[in-house]
Amino acid sequence: MAAFAARYARAFADVVAEAHLPLEQVQQQLDDFMATWNGAADLREVFLDPSFPAEEKVAILDRMNQKLGLAPVVRNFLAVVLQHERMHAMEEILKEFREEMNRRLGITAVSITSARALNEAERKSLLEQVGTLAEGRVDASFHEDASLLGGVVVQIGSKVYDGSVRGRFARLEEQLAVR
């Protein structure tokens, strides 16, 4: 991790908090920008080219903003990142930003992996149980891994709760090998 990514993330989190912007709105706008960024190779090429003048990069950002409708705070943050030639680390900066905001809001990031896609009712039920385990609000990312065979694996920080069929088989195999 680049140390500057954490600094940019903390500074942006400070600005978002001072502006009293809803985190969901800010995150959605950043996601929209990143979707545009990831979908346009020519845009990435220009924004990553240090020989391209920063003023022109910001002008391009402002034209993009006419379609994206970014909050001034979000637009200004992206302009600073562009002016300081840090776009190459944007994914890392945004990851750090999300983690910083979660820390400030007392939200625990969790990863939930299931053997198949979970429907909305299953997700809601699982999130309630995971919230109890995490002792608070959670920001969950859901993943699928058919090799689990069934059940779920929940990761809260460095702690892993393995309720998968594959995990049960592995534990059974260990018990049988000991005997």
Curated annotation (Swiss-Prot):
Pfam family, one: OSCP
Keywords recorded for this protein, A-Z: ATP synthesis, Cell inner membrane, Cell membrane, CF(1), Hydrogen ion transport, Ion transport, Membrane, Transport
A GO MF label: proton-transporting ATP synthase activity, rotational mechanism
Superkingdom assignment: Bacteria
Stored InterPro entries: ATP_synth_OSCP/delta_N_sf (IPR026015), ATPase_OSCP/dsu (IPR000711)
Keyword Transmembrane helix appears in the UniProt entry: no
Entries under Gene3D superfamilies matching the protein: N-terminal domain of the delta subunit of the F1F0-ATP synthase (1.10.520.20)
Broad class of the protein's primary localization: membrane
Entry GO terms, CC: plasma membrane; proton-transporting ATP synthase complex
Membrane topology: Peripheral membrane protein
Subcellular location: Cell inner membrane
Disulfide pattern: none
Family: Belongs to the ATPase delta chain family.
Oligomeric and partner information: F-type ATPases have 2 components, F(1) - the catalytic core - and F(0) - the membrane proton channel. F(1) has five subunits: alpha(3), beta(3), gamma(1), delta(1), epsilon(1). F(0) has three main subunits: a(1), b(2) and c(10-14). The alpha and beta chains form an alternating ring which encloses part of the gamma chain. F(1) is attached to F(0) by a central stalk formed by the gamma and epsilon chains, while a peripheral stalk is formed by the delta and b chains.
Cited function: F(1)F(0) ATP synthase produces ATP from ADP in the presence of a proton or sodium gradient. F-type ATPases consist of two structural domains, F(1) containing the extramembraneous catalytic core and F(0) containing the membrane proton channel, linked together by a central stalk and a peripheral stalk. During catalysis, ATP synthesis in the catalytic domain of F(1) is coupled via a rotary mechanism of the central stalk subunits to proton translocation. This protein is part of the stalk that links CF(0) to CF(1). It either transmits conformational changes from CF(0) to CF(1) or is implicated in proton conduction.
NCBIfam families in the record: ATP_synt_delta
UniProt cross-references to HAMAP family, sorted A to Z: ATP_synth_delta_bact
Protein's UniProt name: ATP synthase subunit delta
Species whose genome carries this gene: Acidobacterium capsulatum (strain ATCC 51196 / DSM 11244 / BCRC 80197 / JCM 7670 / NBRC 15755 / NCIMB 13165 / 161)
Originating gene: atpH
